[in-house]
Amino acid sequence: MLILCAINLLQAGSVFALGQDREDGLPGMPYRTPDEKEFRVCADPENMPYSNEKGEGFENKIAEVLAKDLGKELSYEFWLDRQGYLRNTINAQRCDVIMGMGSDVDNLRTSKPYYRSGYVFVYRKSSNYNIKDWDSPDLRKGIIGLVGQSPPAIALRDHDLMGNAHPYRLQRDLNLPPSEMIDDLVAGKNDIVIIWGPIGGYFAKQSKEPLVIVPIPEFKSEQNSLDTQKGKLEFNISVAVR
């Protein structure tokens, strides 16, 4: 699958060959000079399990494989994944690709998906909960932590569970660790957490408190046809190029 990704990137052509308008990024930042021998990746320097400056994330490892398959030298443009991330990185021509983007992201070309993931329920093993899906009775017994305005919020609403919700910011507070939701679960601030699979699995595995992780079945809203896509819980992930 990784080799197919590399082939797809080659077929897509160089980011600099595409005739799209360039956004300038922040004032005073120099433009990057293209190098045919370089495979430059935009990534967050503090976003495990995906990436960090030490190259320990799984997206770092996939980028290494792609660079090797393409016969190029891997390099990075690190930028915190905040508002303006695309504008200040790939759209400002400071890299060739971004790993781990949704396959249907607007304004960027994407490779064939190299993995698919969804959301998970995470809860303390000591709670003796038995949660398998949205209709599980134990889901109504406690406080449910989730990112506000994320796709699972539609399912939470449709199952009359909004009263149990403990919402978190859509854009992470950089003063807090990426493990914040799992840390709060362990500390008893939440009884259940609904979180994106790779993040939940990574931090749950590191927890000293035994935690249960349950993949959430795909969901489609029945209340409003406009919510069908918003209620989607599983997504294809690709490499994005301009």
Residue ranges and their predicted role:
Residues 72-73, 91-100, 141-143, 181, ...:
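Alpha-to-beta junction loops
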Residues 45-49, 53-68, 121-177, 198-199:
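Bilobed "Venus flytrap"/periplasmic-binding protein-like clamshell domains
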Residues 236-242:
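A short beta-strand structural signal in non-transmembrane regions
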Residues 18-106, 174-175:
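Extracytoplasmic small-molecule ligand-binding "clamshell" domains
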Residues 40-44, 142-147, 193, 240:
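Short, well-ordered beta-strand segments
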Residues 11-19:
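Signal peptide processing junction and immediate N-terminal pro/mature segment
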Residues 64, 68-69, 73-138, 149, ...:
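Acidic, polar ligand-binding/catalytic clefts
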Residues 1-11:
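Bacterial N-terminal signal peptides
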